[in-house]
Amino acid sequence: MRLFGVVVVAMAGALVVSGCASGSEAAVPTDPVAFSETVTVDAVTGHLEQLEKIAANNEGNRSAGTPGYDASVDYVANLLEDKGFEVSTPEFDFSSFDPGTESLKAADGSDVPVRALTYSTSTGPTGITARLVAIPADETPGCEATDYDGRDVNGAIVLVTRGVCPFGDKQKIAADRGAAALLVANNEDAMLGGATLGEPEDARIPTGGVSKASGEALAAAPGDLTLILDTSTETTKSRNVIAQTKTGATDNVVVVGAHLDSVPEGPGINDNGSGTAAVLETALQMGSAPSIENAVRFAFWGAEEVGLVGSTRYVEGLSDQERADIALYLNFDMLGSPNAGYLAYDGDNSDAVGEGPGPEGSAGIERTFVDFLAGRGIAADGTDFDGRSDYGPFIEIGIPAGGVFSGADERKTPAQAEKWGGEAEETFDPNYHSAQDNLANIDREALAANASAVAFGVATYAQDVSGPNGVPVGDARTQARTE
Protein backbone atom coordinates (compact mmCIF):
# COMPACT_ATOMS: atom_id res chain seq x y z
CA MET A 1 0.00 0.00 0.00
CA ARG A 2 2.64 2.51 -1.00
CA LEU A 3 1.10 3.30 -4.39
CA PHE A 4 0.07 6.88 -3.78
CA GLY A 5 3.12 8.98 -4.58
CA VAL A 6 1.69 11.68 -6.82
CA VAL A 7 -1.83 11.59 -5.37
CA VAL A 8 -0.73 11.80 -1.76
CA VAL A 9 1.83 14.55 -2.31
CA ALA A 10 -0.85 16.65 -3.95
CA MET A 11 -3.20 15.85 -1.10
CA ALA A 12 -0.71 16.90 1.55
CA GLY A 13 -0.08 20.18 -0.16
CA ALA A 14 -3.79 20.91 -0.05
CA LEU A 15 -3.82 20.38 3.70
CA VAL A 16 -1.46 23.18 4.63
CA VAL A 17 -4.00 25.94 5.05
CA SER A 18 -2.91 29.55 4.81
CA GLY A 19 -2.96 31.57 8.01
CA CYS A 20 -3.82 34.83 6.24
CA ALA A 21 -7.39 34.12 5.14
CA SER A 22 -10.16 36.38 6.34
CA GLY A 23 -12.80 35.45 8.88
CA SER A 24 -14.28 36.74 12.10
CA GLU A 25 -14.70 34.47 15.11
CA ALA A 26 -14.99 34.86 18.83
CA ALA A 27 -11.63 34.59 20.53
CA VAL A 28 -10.83 31.39 22.36
CA PRO A 29 -10.36 31.96 26.11
CA THR A 30 -6.71 32.39 26.99
CA ASP A 31 -7.41 30.25 30.04
CA PRO A 32 -7.48 26.61 28.84
CA VAL A 33 -9.47 25.55 31.90
CA ALA A 34 -12.18 28.06 31.04
CA PHE A 35 -12.19 26.87 27.44
CA SER A 36 -12.51 23.26 28.55
CA GLU A 37 -15.86 24.12 30.12
CA THR A 38 -17.27 25.25 26.76
CA VAL A 39 -17.11 21.72 25.34
CA THR A 40 -20.08 20.19 27.13
CA VAL A 41 -21.20 16.59 27.27
CA ASP A 42 -24.63 17.61 25.97
CA ALA A 43 -23.14 19.17 22.84
CA VAL A 44 -20.84 16.21 22.28
CA THR A 45 -23.76 13.83 22.76
CA GLY A 46 -25.71 15.80 20.17
CA HIS A 47 -23.04 14.95 17.59
CA LEU A 48 -23.17 11.30 18.65
CA GLU A 49 -26.93 11.28 18.11
CA GLN A 50 -26.40 12.49 14.55
CA LEU A 51 -23.67 9.93 13.86
CA GLU A 52 -25.93 7.17 15.18
CA LYS A 53 -28.73 8.35 12.88
CA ILE A 54 -26.32 8.30 9.96
CA ALA A 55 -25.40 4.70 10.74
CA ALA A 56 -29.05 3.71 11.16
CA ASN A 57 -29.82 5.11 7.71
CA ASN A 58 -26.86 3.32 6.13
CA GLU A 59 -27.02 -0.38 6.99
CA GLY A 60 -26.00 0.15 10.59
CA ASN A 61 -22.45 1.40 10.15
CA ARG A 62 -20.17 4.22 9.04
CA SER A 63 -17.25 2.16 7.77
CA ALA A 64 -14.75 3.46 5.22
CA GLY A 65 -15.83 3.32 1.60
CA THR A 66 -19.56 3.19 2.42
CA PRO A 67 -22.41 5.70 2.13
CA GLY A 68 -22.49 5.86 5.93
CA TYR A 69 -18.92 7.08 6.01
CA ASP A 70 -19.53 9.61 3.24
CA ALA A 71 -22.51 10.97 5.18
CA SER A 72 -20.29 11.26 8.27
CA VAL A 73 -17.76 13.25 6.24
CA ASP A 74 -20.49 15.58 5.03
CA TYR A 75 -21.82 16.08 8.56
CA VAL A 76 -18.43 17.08 9.96
CA ALA A 77 -17.37 19.16 6.96
CA ASN A 78 -20.64 21.11 6.79
CA LEU A 79 -20.50 22.10 10.47
CA LEU A 80 -16.91 23.25 10.13
CA GLU A 81 -17.67 25.24 6.99
CA ASP A 82 -20.63 26.89 8.71
CA LYS A 83 -18.21 28.02 11.42
CA GLY A 84 -15.96 29.69 8.87
CA PHE A 85 -13.30 27.01 8.40
CA GLU A 86 -11.82 26.26 5.02
CA VAL A 87 -12.34 22.52 4.79
CA SER A 88 -10.68 19.97 2.53
CA THR A 89 -11.75 16.35 2.11
CA PRO A 90 -8.82 14.79 0.24
CA GLU A 91 -9.29 11.34 -1.22
CA PHE A 92 -6.93 8.42 -0.84
CA ASP A 93 -7.03 4.82 -1.96
CA PHE A 94 -7.27 1.94 0.46
CA SER A 95 -7.85 -1.78 0.24
CA SER A 96 -11.47 -2.82 0.66
CA PHE A 97 -11.93 -6.31 2.05
CA ASP A 98 -14.74 -8.77 1.25
CA PRO A 99 -14.88 -11.73 3.65
CA GLY A 100 -16.84 -13.85 1.17
CA THR A 101 -17.84 -17.29 2.43
CA GLU A 102 -17.00 -17.87 6.09
CA SER A 103 -17.37 -21.41 7.43
CA LEU A 104 -15.80 -23.57 10.14
CA LYS A 105 -16.59 -27.20 10.93
CA ALA A 106 -15.41 -28.68 14.21
CA ALA A 107 -13.93 -32.16 14.56
CA ASP A 108 -17.40 -33.59 15.24
CA GLY A 109 -18.79 -31.98 12.08
CA SER A 110 -20.74 -29.25 13.85
CA ASP A 111 -20.77 -25.72 12.45
CA VAL A 112 -18.87 -23.06 14.40
CA PRO A 113 -19.51 -19.35 13.67
CA VAL A 114 -16.35 -17.74 12.31
CA ARG A 115 -15.49 -14.32 10.94
CA ALA A 116 -12.55 -13.54 8.67
CA LEU A 117 -10.10 -10.94 9.94
CA THR A 118 -9.73 -8.02 7.55
CA TYR A 119 -7.12 -8.73 4.86
CA SER A 120 -7.00 -12.43 5.69
CA THR A 121 -5.69 -14.47 2.80
CA SER A 122 -8.16 -16.83 1.18
CA THR A 123 -8.48 -20.55 1.76
CA GLY A 124 -10.13 -20.80 -1.62
CA PRO A 125 -13.72 -21.97 -2.02
CA THR A 126 -13.00 -25.54 -0.87
CA GLY A 127 -11.20 -24.49 2.29
CA ILE A 128 -8.49 -26.09 4.42
CA THR A 129 -8.82 -29.27 6.46
CA ALA A 130 -6.12 -29.68 9.10
CA ARG A 131 -5.55 -30.67 12.70
CA LEU A 132 -6.14 -28.11 15.42
CA VAL A 133 -3.36 -27.01 17.77
CA ALA A 134 -4.49 -24.78 20.63
CA ILE A 135 -1.86 -22.49 22.16
CA PRO A 136 -2.59 -22.12 25.90
CA ALA A 137 -3.43 -18.59 27.00
CA ASP A 138 -0.72 -16.84 29.00
CA GLU A 139 0.53 -13.29 29.48
CA THR A 140 1.43 -13.10 25.77
CA PRO A 141 -1.21 -15.26 24.02
CA GLY A 142 0.36 -16.09 20.69
CA CYS A 143 2.36 -12.86 20.74
CA GLU A 144 5.81 -14.39 21.25
CA ALA A 145 7.57 -17.13 19.33
CA THR A 146 8.28 -18.82 22.65
CA ASP A 147 4.54 -19.41 23.09
CA TYR A 148 4.97 -22.16 20.47
CA ASP A 149 7.93 -23.88 22.10
CA GLY A 150 7.44 -27.64 22.24
CA ARG A 151 4.47 -27.60 19.87
CA ASP A 152 4.47 -28.82 16.27
CA VAL A 153 2.12 -26.55 14.35
CA ASN A 154 3.44 -27.17 10.86
CA GLY A 155 0.45 -27.48 8.53
CA ALA A 156 -1.99 -27.09 11.41
CA ILE A 157 -4.84 -24.71 12.16
CA VAL A 158 -3.65 -22.84 15.26
CA LEU A 159 -5.97 -21.44 17.91
CA VAL A 160 -4.86 -18.51 20.10
CA THR A 161 -6.65 -16.12 22.43
CA ARG A 162 -7.22 -12.44 21.71
CA GLY A 163 -5.26 -9.82 23.61
CA VAL A 164 -1.95 -8.05 24.36
CA CYS A 165 -0.61 -7.66 20.79
CA PRO A 166 -2.05 -6.80 17.36
CA PHE A 167 -3.76 -9.58 15.43
CA GLY A 168 -1.20 -9.18 12.68
CA ASP A 169 1.57 -10.11 15.11
CA LYS A 170 -0.27 -13.26 16.18
CA GLN A 171 -0.75 -14.22 12.54
CA LYS A 172 2.89 -13.57 11.60
CA ILE A 173 4.23 -15.69 14.44
CA ALA A 174 1.86 -18.56 13.59
CA ALA A 175 2.86 -18.33 9.92
CA ASP A 176 6.56 -18.28 10.84
CA ARG A 177 6.01 -21.55 12.71
CA GLY A 178 4.43 -23.14 9.64
CA ALA A 179 0.74 -22.93 10.53
CA ALA A 180 -1.70 -23.37 7.66
CA ALA A 181 -4.28 -21.03 9.23
CA LEU A 182 -5.00 -19.17 12.45
CA LEU A 183 -8.10 -18.84 14.61
CA VAL A 184 -8.31 -16.10 17.25
CA ALA A 185 -10.77 -16.68 20.09
CA ASN A 186 -12.34 -13.61 21.66
CA ASN A 187 -11.71 -12.90 25.33
CA GLU A 188 -15.39 -11.96 25.79
CA ASP A 189 -18.63 -13.86 25.20
CA ALA A 190 -19.19 -12.43 21.73
CA MET A 191 -17.97 -12.93 18.19
CA LEU A 192 -14.65 -11.36 17.36
CA GLY A 193 -15.64 -8.42 15.16
CA GLY A 194 -13.83 -5.58 13.40
CA ALA A 195 -10.43 -7.23 13.66
CA THR A 196 -7.72 -6.53 11.10
CA LEU A 197 -4.31 -7.89 10.21
CA GLY A 198 -3.08 -4.35 9.48
CA GLU A 199 -2.52 -3.97 5.74
CA PRO A 200 -2.97 -6.41 2.83
CA GLU A 201 0.74 -7.06 2.55
CA ASP A 202 0.78 -8.15 6.20
CA ALA A 203 -1.52 -11.10 5.45
CA ARG A 204 0.21 -14.46 5.13
CA ILE A 205 -2.23 -17.18 6.19
CA PRO A 206 -6.03 -17.41 6.43
CA THR A 207 -7.08 -15.93 9.77
CA GLY A 208 -10.51 -16.06 11.38
CA GLY A 209 -12.08 -15.04 14.66
CA VAL A 210 -14.43 -17.03 16.91
CA SER A 211 -16.20 -16.35 20.18
CA LYS A 212 -14.73 -17.15 23.57
CA ALA A 213 -17.15 -20.05 24.04
CA SER A 214 -16.36 -21.47 20.61
CA GLY A 215 -12.64 -21.21 21.28
CA GLU A 216 -12.98 -23.07 24.55
CA ALA A 217 -15.09 -25.80 22.92
CA LEU A 218 -12.63 -26.25 20.06
CA ALA A 219 -9.66 -26.45 22.41
CA ALA A 220 -11.44 -29.09 24.50
CA ALA A 221 -12.08 -31.39 21.52
CA PRO A 222 -9.02 -31.37 19.25
CA GLY A 223 -9.16 -33.01 15.85
CA ASP A 224 -9.36 -32.04 12.22
CA LEU A 225 -11.17 -28.79 11.39
CA THR A 226 -12.36 -27.56 8.02
CA LEU A 227 -12.03 -23.80 7.54
CA ILE A 228 -13.38 -21.82 4.59
CA LEU A 229 -12.51 -18.13 4.35
CA ASP A 230 -13.03 -17.33 0.67
CA THR A 231 -11.87 -13.73 0.95
CA SER A 232 -10.96 -11.02 -1.56
CA THR A 233 -9.42 -7.55 -1.40
CA GLU A 234 -9.82 -4.65 -3.85
CA THR A 235 -8.75 -1.02 -4.01
CA THR A 236 -11.35 1.66 -3.22
CA LYS A 237 -11.41 5.27 -2.03
CA SER A 238 -12.06 7.13 1.21
CA ARG A 239 -11.53 10.67 2.50
CA ASN A 240 -10.06 12.57 5.41
CA VAL A 241 -11.55 15.85 6.65
CA ILE A 242 -9.04 18.63 7.37
CA ALA A 243 -9.66 22.14 8.71
CA GLN A 244 -7.09 24.58 10.11
CA THR A 245 -7.53 27.82 12.01
CA LYS A 246 -6.79 30.97 10.03
CA THR A 247 -4.84 32.37 12.97
CA GLY A 248 -1.75 31.22 14.83
CA ALA A 249 1.81 30.48 13.76
CA THR A 250 1.98 28.01 10.90
CA ASP A 251 5.46 26.81 11.88
CA ASN A 252 4.17 25.49 15.23
CA VAL A 253 1.01 23.71 14.14
CA VAL A 254 -0.94 21.70 16.69
CA VAL A 255 -2.55 18.77 14.85
CA VAL A 256 -5.61 17.31 16.58
CA GLY A 257 -7.01 14.07 15.23
CA ALA A 258 -9.77 11.50 15.63
CA HIS A 259 -10.78 8.76 13.25
CA LEU A 260 -14.20 9.17 11.70
CA ASP A 261 -14.89 5.65 10.45
CA SER A 262 -16.53 2.76 12.27
CA VAL A 263 -16.09 -0.95 11.74
CA PRO A 264 -18.64 -2.64 9.43
CA GLU A 265 -20.19 -4.45 12.41
CA GLY A 266 -21.73 -1.39 14.06
CA PRO A 267 -22.31 2.38 14.29
CA GLY A 268 -19.04 3.08 16.11
CA ILE A 269 -20.40 5.54 18.65
CA ASN A 270 -17.65 5.05 21.20
CA ASP A 271 -15.13 3.89 18.59
CA ASN A 272 -14.79 6.49 17.42
CA GLY A 273 -17.81 8.72 17.37
CA SER A 274 -16.80 9.86 20.85
CA GLY A 275 -13.39 11.12 19.77
CA THR A 276 -14.82 12.63 16.59
CA ALA A 277 -17.58 14.44 18.49
CA ALA A 278 -15.22 15.85 21.12
CA VAL A 279 -12.72 17.10 18.54
CA LEU A 280 -15.51 18.51 16.37
CA GLU A 281 -17.12 20.38 19.26
CA THR A 282 -13.69 21.71 20.29
CA ALA A 283 -13.20 23.06 16.77
CA LEU A 284 -16.66 24.63 16.72
CA GLN A 285 -16.13 26.31 20.09
CA MET A 286 -12.68 27.54 19.10
CA GLY A 287 -13.85 28.88 15.76
CA SER A 288 -11.87 29.42 12.61
CA ALA A 289 -10.05 32.61 13.65
CA PRO A 290 -9.43 32.53 17.41
CA SER A 291 -6.85 34.58 19.30
CA ILE A 292 -4.16 31.91 19.53
CA GLU A 293 -0.40 31.79 19.16
CA ASN A 294 -0.19 28.52 17.20
CA ALA A 295 -2.39 27.32 14.37
CA VAL A 296 -4.57 24.30 15.11
CA ARG A 297 -5.25 21.74 12.39
CA PHE A 298 -8.26 19.53 13.03
CA ALA A 299 -8.13 16.17 11.27
CA PHE A 300 -10.83 13.52 10.99
CA TRP A 301 -9.20 10.40 9.60
CA GLY A 302 -10.71 7.85 7.25
CA ALA A 303 -10.02 4.11 7.12
CA GLU A 304 -8.41 3.90 10.55
CA GLU A 305 -10.18 0.62 11.20
CA VAL A 306 -8.46 -1.05 8.25
CA GLY A 307 -4.92 -0.10 9.24
CA LEU A 308 -4.61 3.64 10.07
CA VAL A 309 -4.75 4.33 6.35
CA GLY A 310 -5.99 7.94 6.28
CA SER A 311 -3.50 9.24 8.82
CA THR A 312 -0.68 7.21 7.30
CA ARG A 313 -1.31 8.53 3.79
CA TYR A 314 -1.47 12.06 5.16
CA VAL A 315 1.87 11.79 6.95
CA GLU A 316 3.50 10.08 3.97
CA GLY A 317 2.46 12.97 1.75
CA LEU A 318 3.95 15.75 3.88
CA SER A 319 7.15 17.43 2.74
CA ASP A 320 10.09 17.67 5.13
CA GLN A 321 9.18 21.30 5.86
CA GLU A 322 5.53 20.48 6.47
CA ARG A 323 6.57 17.79 8.93
CA ALA A 324 8.93 20.19 10.68
CA ASP A 325 6.12 22.73 11.02
CA ILE A 326 4.02 20.31 13.10
CA ALA A 327 4.78 20.90 16.77
CA LEU A 328 2.81 17.95 18.12
CA TYR A 329 -0.08 15.60 17.50
CA LEU A 330 -3.02 15.03 19.86
CA ASN A 331 -5.03 11.84 19.31
CA PHE A 332 -8.50 11.07 20.64
CA ASP A 333 -9.87 7.59 20.06
CA MET A 334 -12.62 6.20 22.36
CA LEU A 335 -13.60 8.56 25.17
CA GLY A 336 -16.82 7.08 26.58
CA SER A 337 -16.21 3.38 27.23
CA PRO A 338 -18.97 1.89 29.43
CA ASN A 339 -16.52 0.31 31.90
CA ALA A 340 -14.41 3.41 31.57
CA GLY A 341 -10.75 3.87 32.22
CA TYR A 342 -9.04 7.23 32.50
CA LEU A 343 -5.88 6.81 30.51
CA ALA A 344 -3.27 9.16 29.05
CA TYR A 345 -0.76 8.01 26.46
CA ASP A 346 2.44 7.05 28.26
CA GLY A 347 4.81 9.57 26.73
CA ASP A 348 7.70 8.92 29.13
CA ASN A 349 7.29 5.12 29.39
CA SER A 350 6.91 5.46 33.15
CA ASP A 351 4.63 2.42 33.11
CA ALA A 352 7.36 0.39 31.36
CA VAL A 353 4.77 -1.69 29.50
CA GLY A 354 5.03 -2.69 25.85
CA GLU A 355 6.59 -0.07 23.60
CA GLY A 356 9.05 2.59 24.74
CA PRO A 357 8.42 6.31 25.26
CA GLY A 358 7.04 8.61 22.61
CA PRO A 359 9.24 11.13 20.78
CA GLU A 360 10.75 13.94 22.84
CA GLY A 361 7.96 16.16 24.13
CA SER A 362 5.46 13.32 24.55
CA ALA A 363 6.17 13.14 28.27
CA GLY A 364 5.08 16.76 28.68
CA ILE A 365 1.87 16.10 26.75
CA GLU A 366 1.13 13.19 29.08
CA ARG A 367 1.63 15.45 32.11
CA THR A 368 -0.72 18.04 30.63
CA PHE A 369 -3.58 15.56 30.49
CA VAL A 370 -2.76 13.79 33.75
CA ASP A 371 -2.66 17.11 35.60
CA PHE A 372 -5.94 18.26 34.06
CA LEU A 373 -7.75 15.08 35.07
CA ALA A 374 -6.20 15.28 38.54
CA GLY A 375 -7.77 18.72 38.86
CA ARG A 376 -11.13 17.01 38.36
CA GLY A 377 -10.34 14.44 41.04
CA ILE A 378 -9.41 11.70 38.57
CA ALA A 379 -6.10 9.83 38.93
CA ALA A 380 -5.21 8.78 35.39
CA ASP A 381 -3.06 5.81 34.43
CA GLY A 382 -0.74 5.59 31.44
CA THR A 383 -1.58 3.65 28.30
CA ASP A 384 1.03 2.31 25.93
CA PHE A 385 1.79 3.67 22.47
CA ASP A 386 0.95 0.24 21.02
CA GLY A 387 0.38 1.43 17.45
CA ARG A 388 -3.36 0.78 17.40
CA SER A 389 -4.48 4.35 16.66
CA ASP A 390 -3.63 7.31 14.46
CA TYR A 391 -0.75 8.62 16.57
CA GLY A 392 1.29 5.80 15.02
CA PRO A 393 2.36 7.52 11.76
CA PHE A 394 3.24 10.71 13.65
CA ILE A 395 5.47 9.16 16.30
CA GLU A 396 7.18 7.12 13.58
CA ILE A 397 8.59 10.36 12.15
CA GLY A 398 9.49 11.85 15.53
CA ILE A 399 6.47 14.08 16.15
CA PRO A 400 5.56 14.09 19.85
CA ALA A 401 2.07 12.84 20.59
CA GLY A 402 -0.42 12.30 23.36
CA GLY A 403 -4.07 12.25 24.30
CA VAL A 404 -6.65 10.57 26.50
CA PHE A 405 -8.38 7.22 26.09
CA SER A 406 -11.13 5.39 27.99
CA GLY A 407 -10.03 1.87 27.05
CA ALA A 408 -11.00 -0.76 24.49
CA ASP A 409 -10.59 -4.53 24.81
CA GLU A 410 -8.10 -4.45 27.68
CA ARG A 411 -9.31 -5.57 31.11
CA LYS A 412 -9.75 -3.18 34.00
CA THR A 413 -7.56 -4.18 36.93
CA PRO A 414 -8.87 -4.43 40.49
CA ALA A 415 -6.79 -1.37 41.41
CA GLN A 416 -8.34 0.61 38.55
CA ALA A 417 -11.85 -0.48 39.51
CA GLU A 418 -11.20 0.63 43.07
CA LYS A 419 -10.23 4.16 42.07
CA TRP A 420 -12.52 4.67 39.04
CA GLY A 421 -15.44 2.37 39.74
CA GLY A 422 -16.72 -0.19 37.28
CA GLU A 423 -16.08 -3.90 36.97
CA ALA A 424 -12.65 -5.38 37.65
CA GLU A 425 -11.39 -8.07 35.25
CA GLU A 426 -13.90 -6.96 32.61
CA THR A 427 -12.94 -5.13 29.43
CA PHE A 428 -13.21 -1.35 29.33
CA ASP A 429 -15.60 -1.62 26.38
CA PRO A 430 -17.44 -4.95 26.11
CA ASN A 431 -19.21 -3.55 23.01
CA TYR A 432 -15.94 -2.86 21.18
CA HIS A 433 -16.26 -3.41 17.41
CA SER A 434 -19.82 -4.67 17.66
CA ALA A 435 -23.37 -3.59 16.83
CA GLN A 436 -23.81 -2.72 20.51
CA ASP A 437 -21.32 0.17 20.26
CA ASN A 438 -24.18 2.64 20.39
CA LEU A 439 -25.23 5.76 22.26
CA ALA A 440 -27.07 3.79 24.94
CA ASN A 441 -23.75 2.24 25.96
CA ILE A 442 -21.74 5.46 26.31
CA ASP A 443 -20.53 6.42 29.80
CA ARG A 444 -21.55 10.09 29.97
CA GLU A 445 -19.38 10.80 33.00
CA ALA A 446 -16.26 9.55 31.24
CA LEU A 447 -17.26 11.31 28.04
CA ALA A 448 -17.71 14.60 29.90
CA ALA A 449 -14.30 14.40 31.58
CA ASN A 450 -12.48 13.33 28.44
CA ALA A 451 -14.20 15.83 26.14
CA SER A 452 -13.16 18.61 28.51
CA ALA A 453 -9.64 17.19 28.47
CA VAL A 454 -9.63 17.40 24.67
CA ALA A 455 -10.56 21.08 24.79
CA PHE A 456 -8.04 21.80 27.54
CA GLY A 457 -5.19 20.12 25.70
CA VAL A 458 -5.96 21.85 22.41
CA ALA A 459 -6.27 25.29 24.05
CA THR A 460 -3.09 24.75 26.07
CA TYR A 461 -0.90 24.07 23.07
CA ALA A 462 -2.71 26.55 20.84
CA GLN A 463 -1.39 29.22 23.21
CA ASP A 464 2.08 27.83 23.94
CA VAL A 465 4.00 24.74 22.80
CA SER A 466 7.00 25.47 25.03
CA GLY A 467 7.40 25.43 28.80
CA PRO A 468 7.76 22.54 31.25
CA ASN A 469 5.06 20.48 29.50
CA GLY A 470 5.99 21.69 26.04
CA VAL A 471 7.68 20.17 23.04
CA PRO A 472 10.94 21.00 21.23
CA VAL A 473 10.88 24.16 19.11
CA GLY A 474 13.25 25.62 16.54
CA ASP A 475 16.70 24.04 16.38
CA ALA A 476 15.86 21.79 19.33
CA ARG A 477 13.00 20.30 17.30
CA THR A 478 15.25 19.66 14.33
CA GLN A 479 17.84 18.01 16.53
CA ALA A 480 15.29 15.87 18.38
CA ARG A 481 13.84 14.52 15.15
CA THR A 482 17.17 13.70 13.55
CA GLU A 483 18.73 11.86 16.48
Labelled PLM ranges:
Residues 291, 301-412:
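Metal-dependent peptidase/peptidase-like ectodomains
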Residues 30-40, 57-68, 134, 138, ...:
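Second-shell loop/turn segments in exported
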Residues 38-59, 66, 79-83, 143-145, ...:
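Catalytic-core environment of secreted peptidases
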Residues 66, 113-211, 267, 380:
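Extracellular/luminal Protease-associated
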Residues 119-143, 199-269, 281-284, 288, ...:
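Soluble metallo-hydrolase cores and metallopeptidase-like ectodomains found primarily
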Residues 27, 37, 46-49, 53-152:
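Noncatalytic luminal/extracellular "stalk/propeptide" segments of secretory-pathway proteins
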Residues 411-482:
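His/Asp/Glu-rich mid-to-C-terminal helical/loop segments that flank catalytic regions of hydrolases
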Residues 4, 15-30, 467:
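C-terminal region of N-terminal signal peptides and the immediate post-cleavage residues
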